[in-house]
Amino acid sequence: MSVEQEVINLGKNIFFNAHHSPMGCSPVFTLGYPGQSGGFDLELGSPPNQNIYIGLQDDGQERYRAFPFFGEGLDERDRYTTDESDSGSSERHSVQQEESGLIIPYNRDEIVRRFGAAIDEWQAGDLTFRLISPFEGVPDPETATEEQLRFALMPAVLAEITVDNTRGTSTRKAFFGLQNNDPVSAIRRLEDVTGGRICGIGQGRHTAIARAIRDYQRRIFYDGIDSQAKGSGKPPVWPWSGRAVLMDTPAGEKATYRFGLCFYRPVRHNRNRCSYYYSRYFANIEEVAEYALAQFNRKLEVARQADALVNDAKLSEDQKFIVAHAIRSYYGSTELLEHDGKPLWIVNEGEYRMMNTFDLLVDQLFYELKMNPWTVKNELDLYTSRYSYRDTVDFPGDATEYPGGISFTHDMGVANSFSLPGYSSYELHAIDDCFSHMTHEQLVNWVLSATVYVHQTNDREWLEPQPADSGASLDSMVNRDHPDPSQRTGMMGLDSSRTMGGRKSPPIQPGRLVGASAEQHLFAGKSWAAYVAMEKLFRDNGRKSAAALAGRQPELGAGTITSHLLPGGIFQPSFRRTMTPRSSLRSRVLSSRYTPDAKKRWIQTADSVHILRRCPRI
């Protein structure tokens, strides 16, 4: 990718963080917003706020210009002195920084950014920095070769620094480094543990910036970001806070330096004792670094093809930007795990880190079916085997129970910890609104995901034992409409017994849709689509009776929706059934069918939830 190539038109605002992630490994290298806001993110829920130093020496000067991905910070040595460790040390250090002017950020109007789905590039003056995050279909571990999996699951992204010193009159130093923000591990030199094959820096044993020895001209590790960059000739020392690699580019030359930004954390996930699948092929981060550098050219070609996937699409510039961002964040949330010798595909819910959240699984369904359909089947299989359950249903305000059926949990756990079988980390009992059980929606999500998967792959063998094929999903959906077939509307009308006196909630923030209900806004279209998909499935399989029932429901739903159109086709979202007005959770529990002891427990739960609702979601 040449520096002249335009990827996506960013407009005026080019300063935003973006994820740069390998596939199925969970880590992210975040970069793009000025200041101390990016860095190495290994299973975190937010950017690590790490100083990242990428800069170049001015020609003939002892001054450096750098991309503005770092902020002011105290010299770490101040903590170890007796005379200047008081409150005045911060002011002293700031004055020294300002007077010395050793490292000066580029002005924002000097920087050009070229942003794609896989390649992100910054250019200022004679310095270009490029981050490369290749992505392609993740091979199915059940059928792929060992080398195919090693190549695809390599836990590293790549980087290039290009220094154009063709017009220079002196040798110029470029640097690439970071601030140590790990309270447990110091930054170490990679050549000390690789027999000199790799140079670079590692933060503990989990992250590293690596380069091949044959590829570099000079390396310096320096104490703080400015104490040895002037090239005093003194040997490098062990640093307190920051390290970097310095590269010399002679006058009249243009050079490109390649790096692997590597991650390694083999064993993760509580309860199920899973490990990252890539740990089958890499024993430590040094092996990751050597492999990443050896495969640089192949990975770069994959990244170029990935960029073209989005750039050549018939989308607007805004759409391309959104898709590129979504792909980056998606891969930064993915984990391919191994459990009892079998692959387990996990997609975390961004900063919330809930695992395989079902309402997101259905959102990313078409992308996964395009790139790696086996992951959809893998997720659905785990939902069926571990995170499905059966319930009864009731009308709000009425303790009478009716048959319910099969459904699925909101998620499979949170923050690398699987939840108990049949339960999510999100859903709670005996509450209204957020965090209540989302039984109907997850059932609809399962139907949509399963039917689309079968339609796209024609995997009939997988379908046969599934709830969608057996009719269990259809029975469960119509039971949640109305127990009397003559009163069905194609909408959800009953709540799950799992709400235990509470109310079913849609995954929207309270107040976003004033006066809305789950029936009104979220499930009308999705339920209609699920019924249509099941009708086709049953007809294709010769299940005429089930197909007729599935076909009747979307007709009822469409009639319910269109009956609320105003003159001129204006939609009035008020197709809610007539229901008992909401009462307080406390009074509802007291009047419910539960025993006195159970009522007492649920009232205590309600009081606790009332307090929790005032807190942030995470």
From Swiss-Prot:
Record's catalysed reaction(s): Hydrolysis of (1->4)-beta-D-xylans, to remove successive D-xylose residues from the non-reducing termini
GO CC term (a single one): extracellular region
Cell compartments where the protein resides: Secreted
GO-annotated molecular function: xylan 1,4-beta-xylosidase activity
Record key words, sorted: Carbohydrate metabolism, Glycosidase, Hydrolase, Polysaccharide degradation, Secreted, Signal, Xylan degradation
Presence of keyword Transcription: no
Entry EC no(s): 3.2.1.37
Protein's GO biological process: xylan catabolic process
Enzyme class: hydrolase
Similarity comment text for this entry: Belongs to the glycosyl hydrolase 52 family.
Protein name as annotated: Beta-xylosidase
Species of the source: Geobacillus stearothermophilus
